[in-house]
């Protein structure tokens, strides 16, 4: 590792204050303005790598638009979902019997099912080593509830994730 290398970090709230070329940008904001911010950023600067918060966008059309933009600009994009890199998950993975199916459950009260379930799904997929799953939302309450954050919504109930090999993740979130 080179220790005598100097790097510059810019923290800005206006794109015109950014340099025209740089290696990495981290866009840390809520999902509603994210696509507009990415558009402004990439219209102003040439960027190699982009890190975005989950959930990325608020509609499927925004995902399509962003995908096209990132491809046009040649930007590699990562989603900030870091739990799988926490060392203790590697230790848990080492303890698992690879010949047995994983049946993982997590329970919670009054916390964001919509924005937090992804962390557990990501860990589940890391531990079971599979790349796809089916989701059963039949036990999610049909009532839409206002989130703690204005303008966002939340759901409660049970989600079930099933992989092709039969591994299962059960998420139960209640009020």
Question: Where do the language-model regions lie?
Answer:
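Short loop/edge segments at beta-strand edges and connector loops
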Residues: 12-13, 52, 79-81, 137-139
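NAD(P)-binding Rossmann-fold cofactor-contacting core
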Residues: 1-5
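Active-site beta-strand termini and strand-to-loop segments that position acidic
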Residues: 159-166
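Beta-loop-alpha module in the N-terminal Rossmann-like domain of NAD(P)-dependent dehydrogenases
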Residues: 7-51, 55-69
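A short coil-to-beta-strand element that immediately follows conserved catalytic motifs
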Residues: 128-141
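A conserved mid-domain beta-alpha-beta active-site/ligand-binding segment of alpha/beta enzyme cores
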Residues: 154-157
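Conserved small/polar residues in nucleotide/adenosyl-binding loops
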Residues: 173-175
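A contiguous active-site-proximal alpha/beta segment in oxidoreductase catalytic domains
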Residues: 16, 24-27, 56-121
């Amino acid at each position: 590792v080179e220790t005598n290398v100097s790097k510059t970090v810019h923290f800005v709230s206006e794109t015109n204050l950014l340099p025209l070329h740089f290696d990495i940008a981290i866009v840390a904001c809520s999902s509603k303005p994210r696509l507009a911010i990415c558009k402004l950023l990439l219209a102003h600067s040439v960027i190699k790598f982009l890190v975005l918060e989950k959930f990325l966008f608020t509609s499927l059309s925004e995902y399509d638009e962003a995908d096209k933009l990132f491809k046009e600009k040649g930007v590699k994009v990562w989603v900030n979902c870091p739990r799988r890199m926490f060392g203790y998950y590697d230790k848990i993975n080492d303890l698992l019997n690879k010949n047995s199916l994983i049946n993982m459950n997590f329970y919670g009260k009054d916390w964001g099912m919509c924005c937090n379930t992804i962390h557990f799904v990501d860990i589940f997929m890391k531990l079971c080593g599979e790349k796809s799953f089916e989701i059963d939302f039949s036990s999610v309450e049909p009532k839409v509830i206002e989130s703690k954050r204005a303008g966002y919504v939340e759901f409660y109930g049970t989600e079930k994730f099933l992989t092709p090999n039969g591994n299962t993740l059960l998420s139960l979130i209640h009020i």
